[in-house]
A protein has these predicted regions:
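Pyridoxal 5′-phosphate
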Residues: 1-416
């Protein structure tokens, strides 16, 4: 087949063949997919599982029929609700049970972790971030510097991702903490987490990872990679709904370290004595000791359902399907790029990226709008000129990829 034919009927037929042949079947039937839409924006907000509505309704029913007694009774009592996700959230990020917890939101968790793991000294005042970090992380890091009476302009080191490991080898003795994004939100590039983590530790620094675009997207081994801490959201690839409760990882070697400052809150207190309300804070061992307030159960229900599905399918299987889906889309975008004015800026090697492919076009917002209004293809865009397409392996299909590339070709040809 000539590559140019991939954008026509022959490509649609090939997409159907690839779907039938994939040994990791789609779970599309378990999701509410907007009618007629090729939805490739799961890197922004994942789709809703059908099971979510029932899970939320169960909480509402328990509240209406049991009231306060639902804390200890019902199918999923509220007091230990977060514990029902202890193993599934750990499995999502490659942690040991107890090293990961569902709580707060990503930036709140980042502030919490910086309060514990950014402890500057006169010799080690610096904190390293990457140049193209999502702004919320930059704001949190700058705030952490100010909280210690330091000038962010003097202690926050902003580097290109490719320069971080070398900088740590050369100047790491002045670095207290490193905070990086595992997957770049604009380009979709995946950093070498274990190598950079090792470089940070060689330098004597602690390192934390923002997994917003990595959790549920690529397999993670946070415990084995010796990561100090990590934070993430559950509303992108994990599909737990807008503003979903986030996640936090603390390596077990820090879990009982009394020298590490924790925020302190009653839900992080040992549950055996929590309701005795003692004067002194006695934290739960592990990441759960960083909890502050009791969990929002209505918001936790979609997270529980979503994590259960990931545990059922398995990240390795999902990653295998994801590599094939994104590879097919990549091949199609190459055809578009050969005849239209677009440029793929995501690394081409599968081990350097997740599901997302990012392309540069003129007037990205207008192109994104045209893709949806004319062809019912949902992508998203980020300034100044980037369109992001992310086939989510749980519910996207090869046909979705073909529709996206074919529509992009027509939009860029101005024949629509």
């Amino acid at each position: 087949m000539d590559d140019a034919e991939l954008l026509g009927a022959a490509g649609a037929a090939l997409a159907a063949e690839l779907e039938d042949a994939d040994d990791v079947p789609t779970r599309r039937e378990q999701f509410v997919v907007p009618e007629g839409v090729a939805y490739l924006a799961g890197n922004s907000l994942g789709l809703q599982q059908h099971a979510v509505r029932a899970a939320v309704d169960d909480v509402l029913e328990a509240w209406s029929t049991l009231g306060v007694d639902a804390h200890e009774h019902g199918a999923f009592p509220w007091l230990p609700y977060h514990e029902t996700m202890r193993e599934t959230v750990a499995g999502l990020v490659g942690a040991k049970p107890g090293e990961a917890v569902v709580m707060n939101s990503l930036t709140v968790n980042l502030h919490t972790m910086l309060g514990s793991f950014y402890r500057p000294t006169p010799d080690r005042p610096r904190i390293v971030i990457e140049a193209d970090v999502f702004p919320s992380d930059r704001y949190a890091v700058m705030g952490a510097a100010r909280a210690h009476g330091l000038d962010p302009a003097e202690v926050v080191v902003v580097l290109r991702a490719d320069d971080i490991a070398r900088f740590l080898d050369l100047e790491g003795a002045s670095v207290a903490t490193v905070v990086l994004s595992a997957v770049d939100f604009r380009t979709g590039a995946l950093l070498d987490i274990p190598a950079i983590t090792e470089a940070a530790h060689r330098a004597g620094a602690r390192i934390g990872w923002d997994l917003a675009h990595a959790a549920g997207n690529v397999p993670l081994r946070l415990h084995d990679w010796d990561v100090d801490f990590a934070v993430w959201c559950h509303y992108k690839y994990v599909n737990a709904g807008p503003g979903a409760v986030g996640g936090c990882f603390v390596h077990e070697r820090h879990g009982n370290d009394a020298s590490i400052v924790r925020p302190g809150g009653w839900w992080g207190h040992d549950p055996v004595s929590r309701f005795a309300m003692p004067f002194a804070f006695d934290p739960v061992p592990g990441a759960e000791g960083w909890q502050v307030s009791n969990p929002p159960i209505l918001a936790m229900a979609p997270v529980r359902v979503s994590l259960d599905l990931f545990a059922e399918v398995g990240m390795e299987a999902l990653r295998a399907r994801s590599v094939r889906l994104t590879g097919f889309l990549d091949r199609l975008l190459d055809v578009v790029a050969s005849r239209r004015k677009i440029e793929v800026i995501t690394p081409r090697a599968p081990d350097r990226r997740g599901a997302q492919l990012s392309i540069v076009v003129d007037d990205a917002r207008a192109v994104t709008d045209a893709l949806f209004e004319r062809f019912r293809v949902r992508a998203d865009d980020r300034p100044p000129n980037v369109i992001r397409l992310a086939p989510a392996p749980l519910y996207n299909t090869y046909e979705d990829c073909w529709r996206a590339a074919s529509a992009l070709d027509m939009v860029q040809s101005s024949t629509w």
